[in-house]
């Protein structure tokens, strides 16, 4: 009986693994289409963002120009900090979580890439992804990566929990 159950679990695992590989291949095909290719390459210059996350950001956000500032986009994702204030009493809260939960989850997972490595360090994988982009895009992404890593480590030094530092 145990052997049959284990065999059933293994067959299910193999089936799901094959399905994930098919979806990943399809995502790679979509990302190489002309209308997505350039944007996916640019977003890939950031730490933690690979094809799936970049394509999801592009497709689900649509036109990034509709957001005048980054804080408006953060509110759209539910990553903006909440606040409960009255008169002189100001209470700052965590992220609102009122927004696109799928993109928020993807960006929080992508932020895990910031947690690894020293400030200013580039992995071989990141260098490879940045290779085909312009110097302006790479400089912008490097500046953002350095800022995010510095901010993460600063939060940790000041005693914030890791998950709070990652989301910030």
Protein language model annotation of sequence segments:
Residues 1-168:
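A detector of single, family-specific signature residues
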């Amino acid at each position: 009986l145990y052997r049959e159950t284990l065999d059933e679990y293994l067959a299910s695992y193999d089936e799901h693994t094959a399905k994930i590989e098919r979806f990943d291949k399809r995502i790679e095909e979509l990302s190489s289409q002309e209308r997505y290719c350039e944007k996916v390459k640019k977003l890939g210059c950031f730490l933690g963002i690979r094809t799936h996350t970049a394509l999801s950001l592009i497709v689900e956000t649509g036109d990034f120009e509709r957001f005048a500032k980054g804080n408006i986009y953060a509110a759209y994702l539910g990553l903006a900090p909440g606040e409960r204030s009255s008169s002189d009493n100001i209470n700052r809260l965590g992220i609102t979580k009122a927004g696109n939960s799928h993109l928020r989850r993807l960006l929080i997972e992508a932020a895990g890439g910031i947690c690894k490595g020293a400030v200013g360090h580039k992995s071989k994988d990141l260098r490879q992804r940045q290779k085909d982009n312009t110097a302006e895009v790479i400089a912008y992404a490097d500046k953002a990566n350095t800022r995010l890593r510095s901010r993460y480590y600063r939060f940790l030094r000041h005693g914030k929990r890791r998950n709070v530092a990652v989301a910030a």
